[in-house]
Amino acid sequence: MNQLSESYKVRLSKLVPGSVAFFQYLLKRMTHDRVNVNAGYLAYITLLSIVPMLTVLLSILSKFPVFENVGETLQGYIIDNFVPASGDAVRTALQEFVSNTGKMTAVGGAFLFVAALMLISNIDKNLNYIWRVKDKRRPVFSFSMYWMVLTLGPILVGASIAVTSYVTSLKLIENETLTGAYNLFLRWLPLLLSFFAFMGLYFLVPNKKVYLSHGAIGAAIAAVLFELSKKGFAFYITQFPSYQLIYGALAAIPILFVWVYLCWLIVLIGAEVTAALGEREHWSDDLEMIHSTAELQLTDEGSESRDSANSTSQ
């Protein structure tokens, strides 16, 4: 018993200083990477691209008869579970925007597709910078990946929603205990979806190896922050509705912008946590050292990519 208590004390004595050093390094790293500025930039790009993304997604789903009415279900699910409060105003605005795009020509549709690709490209660049990745993917590979996201992504989302709706309509679960467990699962489903979405983002986007444990920790932190921010943002909007007095009918626009900004801030914080966990040797660095280390890592990545390209050509 004494040996166990001693071992716990030893682990605790190592854990506390290590945690303090990690959080200090994390704050310095986020300061260097200007996370708040990049979140605002991505929010701006997202607002410009959100209608093109929804239009491309819904247009692809409409090509398959099996996904009939899935588009409306998808919009409702996203707004109800991922947009806190004022969902009706945001839903109405998005539906009007998307319906208006149906009147566009083929050239306009091509521009919408390009805008959607630009959003994915900017996400890719920002996350790879957090991981100090200078070795860019080949343009053909990047375009293929973006194309798969825009084409296969909507199909997978539509299939999952269609299957879920079909299973829930069967009413296979009659037992009260199982029904309670099923309802509990549905309540936790948004958190689980957020976790796996962040996990996939932190694993697939960086052109660099990411450890499973690091990605899971970063995704868990981001998912919890996302759920807490939903509740906090909804409380603020409902209890302090000053935005309606100022903006009136246009209140949905600043609400949506602030919420998208918070979402990207959480995404980047989770990415910073994941990347910082893999840099244990730098946890004791000061801010100036972090600046120089980041520049050195980017330079080294670039020189390695050029060397590998030269050796391949030879």
Swiss-Prot record:
Highest taxon of source: Bacteria
Places the protein is found: Cell inner membrane
Transmembrane segments: 41-61, 104-124, 143-163, 185-205, 217-237, 249-269
Membrane topology (UniProt): Multi-pass membrane protein
UniProt keywords, alphabetically: Cell inner membrane, Cell membrane, Membrane, Transmembrane, Transmembrane helix
Pfam families associated with the record: Virul_fac_BrkB
GO cellular component, one term: plasma membrane
Main localization of the protein described in the UniProt heading: membrane
UniProt-listed PANTHER family: INNER MEMBRANE PROTEIN YHJD, UPF0761 MEMBRANE PROTEIN YIHY
NCBIfam families: PRK01637.1, yihY_not_rbn
Family in the record: Belongs to the UPF0761 family.
Protein name: UPF0761 membrane protein VIBHAR_00593
Lineage, uppermost ranks: Bacteria, Pseudomonadati, Pseudomonadota, Gammaproteobacteria, Vibrionales
